[in-house]
C-alpha cells in the first residue's frame, strides 16, 4: 500500500504565524480520527479547528492586554478602566472569532483521519479599531501598534507557509451552524 504524502499545512501546529506573504495570521488545526464516532467527521474537525483557534486567540488577547498595560505605565489605569479594557477586548474577540474561516480540509486516505485548518487574519482586529469612534486617533494608533507588536512577540519570527491541500472533502462555508453563545 502506497502512503499518500500529507499537505504541508497538516504539520503546522495551532498558533500565531506570519504567512509566506508576510500577513499576520492565527491558525487553529483540528482533526478527527476514523475510529471516532461522529456522523459528520468533517464538521467535527472544523469545530475542533475553531476551538484551537479560539485557544490561540485567547492567549494572544491576554498578551495584548499585558502589553497595553505595561506600555502605558505613564498613564496608570484605574481598576474600573482596567476592567473596562479587558471587557471591551473580550467582547471584540468573540465578534472577531466569528469571522474565522476554514481554509483547508484533507482526508488522509491511509488512515481515514480528517484535518481542518481555521484561519483568522490579524487585520480583522486592527480593522475593528476603525469602528470605535469613542477612541481618539492617538489611542487608536497606539492600540494598532500594540496589536501588531503583541502578535510579533508571539511568532518569534516564525513563518509558516500554508499550501492549499488537494481537496478530498468539499470545502464549503457552514451557514447552518448554530452558535452556542
For each feature predicted by the language model, list its residue ranges.
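Domain-level marker for long, solvent-exposed, non-transmembrane regions
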Residues: 1-181
